[in-house]
């Protein structure tokens, strides 16, 4: 099976983009894993599927499949690449579009400097809606916001729990010592938190270092992908949690340094206010792959 694709990246978070606007595309989890495999396939953190929409007021649909073949609700860096793709492919001339994802509707906008800003929607804090099983837990409250205790191996970590259309557990690395995010135990704790039994749909594990009230560093161990160079929804969740906990300033841009580049996040601090994410999106190359016929 011959399959055309576009390789893209946003702050080092890389994607295989597939165009399903003209005809439906049905691949098995094994085929998605093959595409994302960095040794035998193209290589990517996620596969993005661009689809047509017949829903009034919605320009496109957007699906995200992780490197392990699991489908997820949302991907912020992918959303920026999505906008660049549909413009470069001639699918739209609009600078602002509305896109349906499994996590809800997002509204990306193309900026004159080539960056993309995305209305990622309002954050969700209620544990059941994240989803997060908080039964029997006693959180520590800071600035009126909960830090939940999670048992991970031989220690207990504190995490703020937020959904940005997908679940996030945000941990301040100060609890691990003075080494900062570069020395945080991401490889050790990331997979333990990701698959913690309190998160029925697994969770993205964020490791946050606060540099000032408008500047942070972040590493994220993503569901189904492992640690990536950047995570857009993870950056949104980290800033939202930081604002609610009193570490960061509401209503002003917060710079988020990731291993793949800088993202800018802004949130007014109200529970109904959208989170805005701004950052780069680049096309790397266009190619064609002979995809094995394999089921799962």
From Swiss-Prot:
Family: Belongs to the diaminopimelate epimerase family.
Protein's recorded name: Diaminopimelate epimerase
Primary location group: cytoplasm
A single MF term (Gene Ontology): diaminopimelate epimerase activity
Subunit and interaction comment: Homodimer.
Role noted for this protein: Catalyzes the stereoinversion of LL-2,6-diaminopimelate (L,L-DAP) to meso-diaminopimelate (meso-DAP), a precursor of L-lysine and an essential component of the bacterial peptidoglycan.
Gene3D superfamilies: Diaminopimelate Epimerase, Chain A, domain 1
Subcellular location: Cytoplasm
Record-level GO BP terms: lysine biosynthetic process via diaminopimelate
Residues that, per the record, bind substrate: 13, 46, 66, 76-77, 166, 204, 222-223, 232-233
Family matches, as NCBIfam families: DapF
Enzyme kind, highest EC tier: isomerase
Site positions (Could be important to modulate the pK values of the two catalytic cysteine residues): 168, 222
Cellular compartments per GO CC: cytosol
Catalytic activity as recorded in UniProt: (2S,6S)-2,6-diaminopimelate = meso-2,6-diaminopimelate
Disulphide-bridged cysteine pairs: none
PANTHER family xrefs: DIAMINOPIMELATE EPIMERASE, DIAMINOPIMELATE EPIMERASE, CHLOROPLASTIC
Key words of the record: Amino-acid biosynthesis, Cytoplasm, Isomerase, Lysine biosynthesis
Active site, UniProt feature: 75, 231
Signal peptide: none
InterPro entries named among the record's database cross-references: DAP_epimerase_AS, DAP_epimerase_DapF
Enzyme Commission number(s) from the entry: 5.1.1.7
UniProt keyword rRNA-binding, yes or no: no
């Amino acid at each position: 099976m011959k399959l055309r694709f576009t390789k893209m990246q946003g702050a080092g978070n890389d994607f295989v983009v597939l165009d399903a606007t003209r005809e439906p595309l049905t691949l098995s989890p094994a085929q998605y894993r093959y595409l994302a495999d960095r040794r035998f396939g193209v290589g990517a953190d996620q596969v993005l599927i661009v689809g047509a929409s017949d829903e009034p007021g919605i320009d496109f649909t957007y699906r995200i499949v992780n490197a392990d073949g699991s489908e997820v609700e949302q991907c912020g860096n992918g959303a920026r690449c999505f906008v660049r793709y549909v413009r470069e492919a001639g699918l739209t001339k609009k600078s602002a579009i509305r896109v349906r994802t499994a996590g809800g509707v997002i509204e990306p906008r193309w900026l004159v400097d080539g960056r993309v800003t995305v209305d990622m929607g309002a954050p969700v804090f209620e544990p059941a809606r994240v989803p997060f099983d908080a039964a029997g837990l006693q959180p520590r409250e800071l600035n009126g916001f909960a830090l939940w205790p999670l048992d991970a191996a031989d220690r207990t970590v504190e995490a703020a729990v937020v959904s940005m259309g997908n679940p996030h557990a945000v941990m301040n690395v100060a609890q691990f010592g003075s080494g900062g995010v570069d020395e945080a135990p991401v490889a050790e704790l990331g997979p333990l938190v990701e698959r913690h039994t309190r998160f029925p749909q697994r969770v993205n594990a964020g490791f946050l270092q606060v540099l000032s009230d408008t500047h942070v560093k972040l590493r994220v161990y993503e569901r189904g992908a492992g640690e990536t160079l950047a995570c857009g929804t993870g950056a949104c969740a980290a800033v939202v949690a930081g604002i609610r906990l009193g570490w960061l300033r509401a209503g002003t841009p917060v710079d988020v340094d990731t291993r793949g580049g800088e993202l800018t996040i802004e949130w007014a601090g109200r529970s109904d206010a959208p989170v805005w994410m701004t950052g780069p999106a680049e096309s790397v190359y266009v190619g064609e792959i002979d995809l094995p016929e394999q089921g799962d």
